């Protein structure tokens, strides 16, 4: 859930430009769908990048690097020779957001988890054939891709269970795998960063788009199916949370921000079911005004992830100021180069 689409079309009038931006923003923020134990016949296998690349300081740096290195993977991630040890017995599988990749969303956090002693894996899911950016297609099918990848990781590492960390669409997609596709027995801890748990209204833009005949169909074609699936009240969101937003046997943790630019009201990030813990960045560090777009590049958030996955060994997160709106310019530029 990454791209902000800023319409540069001319001659369409202000109304058309505003609608284009509104629907694009509303869609780009929300992503997720259903995962399955078996991958649908004829659906392309997920791309698994293995060309290790350096950590980046922000989304733009990762996008620029990927332009010349489309198979880039976060350093140390997808080492299928990695053997989990007694201190870190469960592999960690990362799931990127919309219009993104394993590298653009995890170039910073991935290596930190590797350095902490975890076996870490990440796929590029939900892309069209030949795509260089992913997480744009039907999330249900993406979840099927993810399920197959979890099976591969468990088989290769001989791990009974894994931990999952999903960002934005990746949070909902992985939660669908856990809750709806029978993935719970294979998962110990699920972590959702900037999770659009109950979708978003994008400061009122989503309800407006939902009232305009054909607007969401246009959005699916111009932005992506996955984006539109995560608007508050969409059929996908209703399906995902029907019967409760958690299932027994899995530890659930969300990490969100009060100033998330894409998920408003921010309370839509929180899970309500048994076994859920909801961490708000500003409750732990009031000076950190990280929002949606900087979430996976905020060192404090990375420290929170380590704390959740390895509470006995992770250092205490260090609170440092982060300015409101950090990361937005980089995402806008990165989405238009």
For the regions a protein language model found, what residue spans apply to each?
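Flexible, membrane-associating and regulatory peripheral segments of lipid-active enzymes
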Residues: 2-116, 320-327, 333-337
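Extracellular/periplasmic catalytic domains that process cell-envelope and extracellular macromolecules
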Residues: 84-88, 114-115, 156-157, 165, ...
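Serine-dependent carboxylesterase/thioesterase catalytic core
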Residues: 95-96, 120, 140-241
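Second-shell loop/turn segments in exported
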Residues: 97-101, 132-139, 225-227, 289-295
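Alpha/beta-hydrolase active-site loop signature
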Residues: 99, 127-129, 197
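Short N-terminal helix/helix-N-cap motif within the alpha/beta-hydrolase-1
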Residues: 102-104, 130, 201
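Conserved alpha/beta-hydrolase
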Residues: 113-130
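C-terminal catalytic-base region of ester-bond hydrolases, centering on the histidine
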Residues: 248-337
């Amino acid at each position: 859930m990454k791209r902000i689409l800023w319409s540069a079309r001319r001659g369409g009038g202000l109304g058309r430009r505003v609608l284009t931006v509104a629907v694009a923003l509303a869609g780009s923020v929300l992503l997720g769908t259903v995962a399955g134990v078996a991958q649908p016949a004829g659906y392309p296998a997920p791309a698994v990048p293995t060309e290790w690349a350096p950590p980046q300081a922000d989304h733009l740096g990762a996008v620029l690097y990927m332009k010349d290195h489309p198979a880039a993977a976060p350093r140390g991630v997808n080492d299928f020779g990695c053997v989990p040890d007694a201190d870190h017995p469960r592999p960690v599988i990362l799931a990127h957001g919309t219009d993104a990749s394993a590298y653009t969303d995890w170039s910073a956090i991935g290596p930190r988890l590797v350095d902490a002693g975890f076996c870490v894996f990440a796929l590029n899911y939900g892309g069209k054939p030949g795509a260089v950016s992913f997480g744009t297609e039907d999330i249900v099918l993406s979840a099927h891709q993810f399920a197959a990848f979890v099976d591969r990781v468990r088989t290769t590492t001989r791990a009974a269970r894994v931990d999952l960390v999903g960002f934005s669409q990746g949070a909902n997609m992985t939660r669908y795998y856990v809750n709806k596709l029978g993935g719970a027995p294979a998962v110990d801890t699920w972590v959702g960063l900037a999770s659009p748990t109950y979708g978003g209204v994008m400061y009122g833009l989503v309800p407006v788009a939902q009232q305009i005949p054909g607007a969401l169909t246009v959005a699916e074609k111009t932005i992506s199916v996955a984006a539109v699936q995560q608007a508050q009240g969409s059929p996908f969101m209703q399906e995902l949370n029907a019967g409760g937003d958690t299932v027994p046997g899995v530890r659930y943790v969300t990490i969100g921000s009060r100033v998330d630019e894409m998920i408003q009201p921010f309370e839509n990030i929180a899970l309500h079911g048994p076994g859920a813990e909801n961490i708000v960045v500003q409750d732990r560090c009031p000076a950190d005004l990280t929002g949606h777009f900087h979430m996976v590049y905020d060192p404090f958030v990375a420290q929170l992830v380590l704390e959740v996955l390895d509470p006995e060994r992770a250092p205490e997160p260090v609170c440092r100021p982060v300015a409101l709106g950090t990361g937005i310019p980089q995402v806008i530029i990165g989405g238009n180069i």
